[in-house]
Swiss-Prot record:
Its cofactor is Mo-molybdopterin. This is Mitochondrial amidoxime-reducing component 1. One of its GO terms (molecular function) is molybdopterin cofactor binding. A lipid is attached at residue 2 (N-myristoyl glycine). Mo-molybdopterin binds at residues 70-71, 95, 214, 241, 243, 274-276, 320. SUPFAM superfamilies: MOSC N-terminal domain-like, PK beta-barrel domain-like. It is found in: Mitochondrion outer membrane; Membrane. The chain crosses the membrane at residues 25-44. Comprises two structural domains, the molybdenum cofactor/Moco sulfurase C-terminal (MOSC) domain and the MOSC N-terminal region, forming a cleft that accommodates Moco. The MOSC domain, which contains a large seven-stranded mostly antiparallel beta-barrel, engages multiple interactions with Moco both pterin ring and phosphate group, allowing for a tight coordination of Moco within the core of the enzyme.
Length: 340
Protein backbone atom coordinates (compact mmCIF):
# COMPACT_ATOMS: atom_id res chain seq x y z
CA UNK A 1 0.00 0.00 0.00
CA UNK A 2 1.41 3.45 -0.97
CA UNK A 3 1.93 6.28 1.49
CA UNK A 4 -1.13 8.18 0.21
CA UNK A 5 -3.39 5.08 0.48
CA UNK A 6 -2.04 4.34 3.95
CA UNK A 7 -2.84 7.89 5.14
CA UNK A 8 -6.35 7.70 3.72
CA UNK A 9 -6.96 4.35 5.40
CA UNK A 10 -5.64 5.71 8.69
CA UNK A 11 -8.18 8.58 8.61
CA UNK A 12 -11.04 6.37 7.48
CA UNK A 13 -11.02 7.43 3.81
CA UNK A 14 -10.08 4.14 2.16
CA UNK A 15 -13.20 4.21 0.00
CA UNK A 16 -12.69 7.84 -1.06
CA UNK A 17 -12.29 8.41 -4.82
CA UNK A 18 -12.94 11.41 -7.07
CA UNK A 19 -15.01 10.15 -10.03
CA UNK A 20 -13.33 10.52 -13.40
CA UNK A 21 -9.87 11.29 -11.98
CA UNK A 22 -6.79 9.05 -12.10
CA UNK A 23 -5.83 7.33 -8.88
CA UNK A 24 -2.59 9.27 -8.62
CA UNK A 25 -4.43 12.60 -8.89
CA UNK A 26 -6.95 12.05 -6.12
CA UNK A 27 -4.35 10.47 -3.86
CA UNK A 28 -2.19 13.57 -4.27
CA UNK A 29 -5.04 15.95 -3.53
CA UNK A 30 -6.06 13.98 -0.45
CA UNK A 31 -2.49 13.83 0.82
CA UNK A 32 -2.09 17.60 0.46
CA UNK A 33 -5.34 18.18 2.35
CA UNK A 34 -4.30 15.88 5.18
CA UNK A 35 -0.92 17.56 5.37
CA UNK A 36 -2.54 20.98 5.68
CA UNK A 37 -4.84 19.75 8.46
CA UNK A 38 -1.92 18.16 10.30
CA UNK A 39 0.22 21.29 10.07
CA UNK A 40 -2.67 23.46 11.24
CA UNK A 41 -3.31 21.16 14.21
CA UNK A 42 0.34 21.21 15.23
CA UNK A 43 0.49 25.02 14.98
CA UNK A 44 -2.70 25.42 17.03
CA UNK A 45 -1.50 23.01 19.72
CA UNK A 46 1.83 24.79 19.96
CA UNK A 47 0.31 28.26 20.15
CA UNK A 48 -2.48 27.44 22.62
CA UNK A 49 -0.31 26.11 25.47
CA UNK A 50 2.06 29.08 25.10
CA UNK A 51 -0.83 31.50 25.48
CA UNK A 52 -2.21 29.66 28.47
CA UNK A 53 1.21 29.54 30.15
CA UNK A 54 1.43 33.31 29.86
CA UNK A 55 -1.80 33.81 31.83
CA UNK A 56 -1.46 34.83 35.44
CA UNK A 57 -4.49 35.56 37.62
CA UNK A 58 -4.02 38.94 39.23
CA UNK A 59 -7.46 39.59 40.68
CA UNK A 60 -11.23 39.19 40.50
CA UNK A 61 -13.95 41.48 39.18
CA UNK A 62 -15.57 42.91 42.33
CA UNK A 63 -17.83 45.64 40.88
CA UNK A 64 -19.11 46.76 37.48
CA UNK A 65 -20.45 50.29 37.00
CA UNK A 66 -22.25 52.01 34.15
CA UNK A 67 -22.91 55.75 34.20
CA UNK A 68 -25.65 56.24 31.59
CA UNK A 69 -25.66 60.06 31.92
CA UNK A 70 -22.27 61.71 32.11
CA UNK A 71 -21.58 62.92 35.69
CA UNK A 72 -24.82 61.39 37.01
CA UNK A 73 -25.38 58.46 39.37
CA UNK A 74 -23.77 55.16 38.50
CA UNK A 75 -25.64 51.89 38.04
CA UNK A 76 -24.07 48.82 39.65
CA UNK A 77 -24.59 45.73 37.47
CA UNK A 78 -23.69 42.06 37.81
CA UNK A 79 -22.59 41.70 34.19
CA UNK A 80 -22.04 43.91 31.17
CA UNK A 81 -21.09 43.68 27.53
CA UNK A 82 -17.73 45.21 26.67
CA UNK A 83 -17.93 47.13 23.40
CA UNK A 84 -15.37 49.34 21.69
CA UNK A 85 -17.13 52.39 23.16
CA UNK A 86 -17.54 51.09 26.70
CA UNK A 87 -19.88 48.97 28.81
CA UNK A 88 -23.43 48.15 27.77
CA UNK A 89 -26.17 46.73 29.98
CA UNK A 90 -29.35 46.07 28.04
CA UNK A 91 -30.45 49.38 26.54
CA UNK A 92 -28.14 51.39 28.78
CA UNK A 93 -24.67 52.32 27.62
CA UNK A 94 -21.93 54.07 29.52
CA UNK A 95 -22.09 57.86 29.12
CA UNK A 96 -24.40 57.83 26.09
CA UNK A 97 -26.53 60.63 27.60
CA UNK A 98 -25.30 64.13 28.35
CA UNK A 99 -26.57 67.31 30.01
CA UNK A 100 -25.68 70.47 28.08
CA UNK A 101 -26.24 74.19 28.61
CA UNK A 102 -27.82 76.58 26.15
CA UNK A 103 -24.50 77.00 24.31
CA UNK A 104 -24.21 73.23 23.83
CA UNK A 105 -21.34 72.80 26.28
CA UNK A 106 -21.32 69.79 28.58
CA UNK A 107 -22.52 70.30 32.14
CA UNK A 108 -20.74 68.04 34.63
CA UNK A 109 -20.55 67.63 38.39
CA UNK A 110 -17.44 69.80 38.34
CA UNK A 111 -19.79 72.75 37.84
CA UNK A 112 -23.04 71.26 39.16
CA UNK A 113 -22.29 68.70 41.91
CA UNK A 114 -25.98 67.76 42.30
CA UNK A 115 -25.81 65.96 38.97
CA UNK A 116 -24.47 62.91 40.83
CA UNK A 117 -27.90 62.52 42.47
CA UNK A 118 -29.72 61.99 39.16
CA UNK A 119 -30.16 58.39 38.03
CA UNK A 120 -31.28 56.93 34.73
CA UNK A 121 -32.68 53.40 34.76
CA UNK A 122 -34.42 51.25 32.19
CA UNK A 123 -37.31 48.80 32.41
CA UNK A 124 -38.84 47.20 29.33
CA UNK A 125 -39.14 50.02 26.79
CA UNK A 126 -39.08 52.92 29.24
CA UNK A 127 -36.33 55.04 30.75
CA UNK A 128 -36.81 56.61 34.17
CA UNK A 129 -35.11 59.80 35.35
CA UNK A 130 -35.16 59.97 39.13
CA UNK A 131 -33.71 61.93 42.03
CA UNK A 132 -34.53 62.37 45.71
CA UNK A 133 -37.58 64.51 46.51
CA UNK A 134 -38.36 64.82 42.79
CA UNK A 135 -41.11 63.12 40.81
CA UNK A 136 -39.82 60.50 38.38
CA UNK A 137 -39.92 61.27 34.68
CA UNK A 138 -40.61 58.50 32.15
CA UNK A 139 -38.96 58.73 28.74
CA UNK A 140 -38.85 56.52 25.63
CA UNK A 141 -35.65 54.53 25.18
CA UNK A 142 -35.01 56.26 21.86
CA UNK A 143 -35.97 59.93 21.47
CA UNK A 144 -38.38 60.55 18.56
CA UNK A 145 -36.61 61.09 15.24
CA UNK A 146 -38.50 64.38 14.99
CA UNK A 147 -36.54 65.74 17.97
CA UNK A 148 -33.71 68.02 16.82
CA UNK A 149 -30.07 67.00 16.56
CA UNK A 150 -28.00 69.35 18.69
CA UNK A 151 -24.34 70.25 18.32
CA UNK A 152 -22.59 69.64 21.63
CA UNK A 153 -19.07 70.06 22.97
CA UNK A 154 -17.30 67.70 25.35
CA UNK A 155 -13.91 69.01 26.46
CA UNK A 156 -13.95 71.31 23.46
CA UNK A 157 -14.60 68.60 20.87
CA UNK A 158 -17.75 68.72 18.75
CA UNK A 159 -20.23 65.86 18.91
CA UNK A 160 -23.93 65.48 18.16
CA UNK A 161 -26.76 64.49 20.45
CA UNK A 162 -30.47 63.85 19.92
CA UNK A 163 -32.52 66.16 22.12
CA UNK A 164 -34.58 64.16 24.63
CA UNK A 165 -37.45 66.66 24.62
CA UNK A 166 -38.93 69.51 26.61
CA UNK A 167 -40.08 67.40 29.55
CA UNK A 168 -36.55 66.08 30.11
CA UNK A 169 -35.07 69.57 29.73
CA UNK A 170 -37.46 71.05 32.26
CA UNK A 171 -36.97 68.17 34.70
CA UNK A 172 -33.15 68.48 34.68
CA UNK A 173 -33.19 72.30 34.73
CA UNK A 174 -35.61 72.33 37.67
CA UNK A 175 -33.61 69.83 39.70
CA UNK A 176 -30.32 71.64 39.10
CA UNK A 177 -31.94 75.07 39.46
CA UNK A 178 -30.35 76.05 36.17
CA UNK A 179 -31.88 77.66 33.13
CA UNK A 180 -31.96 76.12 29.67
CA UNK A 181 -30.40 72.71 30.35
CA UNK A 182 -31.01 70.02 27.75
CA UNK A 183 -30.59 66.25 27.93
CA UNK A 184 -29.23 64.64 24.76
CA UNK A 185 -28.65 61.06 23.63
CA UNK A 186 -25.87 59.68 21.45
CA UNK A 187 -27.22 57.48 18.64
CA UNK A 188 -25.37 54.73 16.73
CA UNK A 189 -25.29 56.63 13.43
CA UNK A 190 -23.56 59.63 15.02
CA UNK A 191 -19.83 60.19 14.75
CA UNK A 192 -18.01 59.43 18.02
CA UNK A 193 -15.23 61.53 19.50
CA UNK A 194 -11.69 60.33 18.90
CA UNK A 195 -9.83 59.48 22.11
CA UNK A 196 -6.63 60.31 20.28
CA UNK A 197 -7.77 63.92 19.96
CA UNK A 198 -7.75 64.07 23.75
CA UNK A 199 -4.49 62.21 24.33
CA UNK A 200 -2.05 61.13 21.61
CA UNK A 201 -1.27 57.85 23.42
CA UNK A 202 -4.65 56.43 22.34
CA UNK A 203 -4.96 54.55 19.06
CA UNK A 204 -6.75 55.93 16.03
CA UNK A 205 -9.52 53.36 16.47
CA UNK A 206 -10.24 54.28 20.12
CA UNK A 207 -13.49 56.25 20.26
CA UNK A 208 -16.02 57.40 22.85
CA UNK A 209 -19.39 59.13 23.00
CA UNK A 210 -19.50 61.46 26.02
CA UNK A 211 -16.80 59.86 28.21
CA UNK A 212 -13.81 62.08 28.95
CA UNK A 213 -11.30 60.09 26.89
CA UNK A 214 -11.41 56.33 27.37
CA UNK A 215 -14.10 53.64 27.13
CA UNK A 216 -12.96 51.84 30.31
CA UNK A 217 -11.63 52.96 33.68
CA UNK A 218 -10.18 50.27 35.96
CA UNK A 219 -9.49 50.69 39.68
CA UNK A 220 -8.49 48.21 42.37
CA UNK A 221 -9.99 47.91 45.84
CA UNK A 222 -6.46 47.79 47.25
CA UNK A 223 -5.60 51.19 45.77
CA UNK A 224 -8.82 52.67 47.14
CA UNK A 225 -8.11 51.21 50.58
CA UNK A 226 -4.58 52.65 50.51
CA UNK A 227 -6.00 56.10 49.78
CA UNK A 228 -8.62 55.75 52.52
CA UNK A 229 -5.90 54.87 55.03
CA UNK A 230 -4.52 58.38 54.45
CA UNK A 231 -7.85 60.24 54.72
CA UNK A 232 -9.80 61.42 57.75
CA UNK A 233 -13.07 60.69 55.96
CA UNK A 234 -13.31 57.65 53.73
CA UNK A 235 -14.37 57.89 50.10
CA UNK A 236 -16.03 55.35 47.83
CA UNK A 237 -15.07 53.86 44.50
CA UNK A 238 -17.87 55.93 42.97
CA UNK A 239 -16.00 59.13 43.88
CA UNK A 240 -13.71 58.08 41.02
CA UNK A 241 -16.38 56.70 38.68
CA UNK A 242 -14.62 53.49 37.60
CA UNK A 243 -16.24 50.96 35.28
CA UNK A 244 -14.41 47.89 36.58
CA UNK A 245 -13.29 47.47 40.19
CA UNK A 246 -10.83 44.66 40.89
CA UNK A 247 -10.28 42.82 44.17
CA UNK A 248 -7.52 40.44 45.25
CA UNK A 249 -4.55 42.35 43.86
CA UNK A 250 -1.78 44.47 45.32
CA UNK A 251 -1.87 48.22 45.89
CA UNK A 252 -1.69 50.06 42.55
CA UNK A 253 -1.14 46.75 40.76
CA UNK A 254 -3.38 48.04 37.95
CA UNK A 255 -0.69 50.60 37.10
CA UNK A 256 1.47 47.82 35.63
CA UNK A 257 -1.12 45.69 33.82
CA UNK A 258 -0.40 46.17 30.13
CA UNK A 259 -3.09 43.77 28.93
CA UNK A 260 -5.71 41.77 30.83
CA UNK A 261 -8.13 38.97 29.99
CA UNK A 262 -11.55 38.75 31.68
CA UNK A 263 -13.64 35.91 30.24
CA UNK A 264 -13.27 36.41 26.50
CA UNK A 265 -12.67 40.14 26.89
CA UNK A 266 -9.19 41.53 26.32
CA UNK A 267 -8.42 45.04 27.51
CA UNK A 268 -5.23 46.99 26.84
CA UNK A 269 -3.96 49.65 29.22
CA UNK A 270 -3.43 53.05 27.65
CA UNK A 271 -2.58 55.52 30.43
CA UNK A 272 -3.37 56.54 33.99
CA UNK A 273 -6.42 58.65 34.78
CA UNK A 274 -5.71 62.16 35.99
CA UNK A 275 -7.92 63.41 38.80
CA UNK A 276 -9.82 66.67 39.20
CA UNK A 277 -12.43 68.37 41.41
CA UNK A 278 -15.07 65.80 40.45
CA UNK A 279 -13.48 63.38 42.94
CA UNK A 280 -14.36 65.78 45.77
CA UNK A 281 -18.11 65.46 45.14
CA UNK A 282 -19.81 63.11 47.59
CA UNK A 283 -21.80 60.68 45.40
CA UNK A 284 -24.45 60.28 48.12
CA UNK A 285 -25.09 63.93 48.97
CA UNK A 286 -24.03 65.86 45.88
CA UNK A 287 -21.94 68.18 48.05
CA UNK A 288 -18.39 69.05 47.00
CA UNK A 289 -15.64 69.14 49.62
CA UNK A 290 -13.50 71.11 47.12
CA UNK A 291 -10.41 69.63 48.78
CA UNK A 292 -10.37 65.93 49.61
CA UNK A 293 -9.45 63.38 48.40
CA UNK A 294 -7.74 65.48 45.73
CA UNK A 295 -5.24 67.18 48.05
CA UNK A 296 -4.15 63.89 49.57
CA UNK A 297 -3.72 62.34 46.13
CA UNK A 298 -1.50 65.26 45.15
CA UNK A 299 0.78 64.46 48.09
CA UNK A 300 1.78 61.02 46.82
CA UNK A 301 0.23 60.20 43.42
CA UNK A 302 1.88 62.67 41.06
CA UNK A 303 3.47 61.23 37.94
CA UNK A 304 7.18 60.84 37.33
CA UNK A 305 8.69 64.12 36.06
CA UNK A 306 9.44 62.39 32.75
CA UNK A 307 5.67 61.99 32.18
CA UNK A 308 4.59 65.55 32.97
CA UNK A 309 3.98 66.27 29.30
CA UNK A 310 1.22 63.63 29.45
CA UNK A 311 -0.21 64.15 32.93
CA UNK A 312 0.80 67.65 33.93
CA UNK A 313 0.66 68.26 37.68
CA UNK A 314 -2.61 66.43 38.32
CA UNK A 315 -2.58 63.31 40.52
CA UNK A 316 -3.23 59.94 38.89
CA UNK A 317 -5.55 57.25 40.25
CA UNK A 318 -6.95 54.33 38.24
CA UNK A 319 -6.07 53.31 34.71
CA UNK A 320 -7.66 53.87 31.31
CA UNK A 321 -8.07 50.75 29.17
CA UNK A 322 -9.17 50.24 25.56
CA UNK A 323 -10.82 47.20 23.97
CA UNK A 324 -8.81 44.51 22.21
CA UNK A 325 -11.47 41.78 22.09
CA UNK A 326 -15.19 42.19 22.92
CA UNK A 327 -17.39 39.98 25.07
CA UNK A 328 -19.27 39.86 28.36
CA UNK A 329 -17.74 40.25 31.80
CA UNK A 330 -19.33 39.38 35.14
CA UNK A 331 -18.78 40.14 38.79
CA UNK A 332 -16.72 37.25 40.13
CA UNK A 333 -14.78 36.69 36.90
CA UNK A 334 -11.05 36.10 37.36
CA UNK A 335 -8.76 38.74 35.88
CA UNK A 336 -5.70 37.40 34.09
CA UNK A 337 -2.58 39.28 33.12
CA UNK A 338 -1.57 38.43 29.58
CA UNK A 339 2.10 37.87 28.79
CA UNK A 340 4.17 41.02 28.97
Amino acid sequence: MGAGSWALTLFGFSAFRVPGQPRSTWLGVAALGLAAVALGTVAWRRARPRRRRRLQQVGTVAQLWIYPIKSCKGLSVSEAECTAMGLRYGHLRDRFWLVINEEGNMVTARQEPRLVLISLTCEDDTLTLSAAYTKDLLLPITPPATNPLLQCRVHGLEIQGRDCGEDAAQWVSSFLKMQSCRLVHFEPHMRPRSSRQMKAVFRTKDQVAYSDASPFLVLSEASLEDLNSRLERRVKATNFRPNIVISGCGVYAEDSWNEVLIGDVELKRVMACTRCLLTTVDPDTGISDRKEPLETLKSYRLCDPSEQALYGKLPIFGQYFALENPGTIRVGDPVYLLGQ
